[in-house]
Amino acid sequence: MKMKKLMMVALVSSTLALSGCGAMSTAIKKRNLEVKTQMSETIWLEPASERTVFLQIKNTSDKDMSGLQGKIADAVKAKGYQVVTSPDKAYYWIQANVLKADKMDLRESQGWLNRGYEGAAVGAALGAGITGYNSNSAGATLGVGLAAGLVGMAADAMVEDVNYTMITDVQIAERTKATVTTDNVAALRQGTSGAKIQTSTETGNQHKYQTRVVSNANKVNLKFEEAKPVLEDQLAKSIANIL
């Protein structure tokens, strides 16, 4: 009987250790804020002596980004460019729209998976298994095992690996001496089974380039209030570095 109790205590201790190790490992590895930014396409601009830029920054996400345009303007100025309020007086146009800024699985934004931990599941399974070693008090032992599993779940709940992603579409236009002809084609839906094709042609003096910027902020128990400024800084830096 004494041996069975010792075995039960040992298994419960192991359960608690297993349930907590995953959470502890995540807390240690993700204790510092990590920020990564990627661009879907490289934009090559022709070298020019003109250094005037017009900014048009939009935000259609559900997050407040009221200070983003100011950060982008500061980053552009730091590169030696002048930000102007009139598009007609600017050599470059930078247009950007924040599509989404929210919690997101890294597989969706970066294509790689941050493996999680399974402490709580192991704790519950091992706890139930203790019953086989104490047939005289199966109910009580099962209760101890389930309690150990719940402790593991509580430990896991306190440690969450959080990733915030900001997705931004960017269009940059640069003036050119050549005449640029642009053909626009749009498919407009008509009900559920049809579409109307709309085409137009225009001429101008700008080459336009498009890219998408994806920024990730990753940390244990990360809140958006902490992620927001670094995500904005990374976006501003990436846009300014195109010039």
UniProtKB/Swiss-Prot annotation:
PROSITE patterns: PROKAR_LIPOPROTEIN. Belongs to the TraT lipoprotein family. Residues 1-20 form the signal peptide. The gene is traT. It is a lipid-anchor. The keyword Signal applies. It comes from the Bacteria. It is found in: Cell outer membrane. This is TraT complement resistance protein. InterPro entries: TraT_complement-R. Pfam families: TraT.
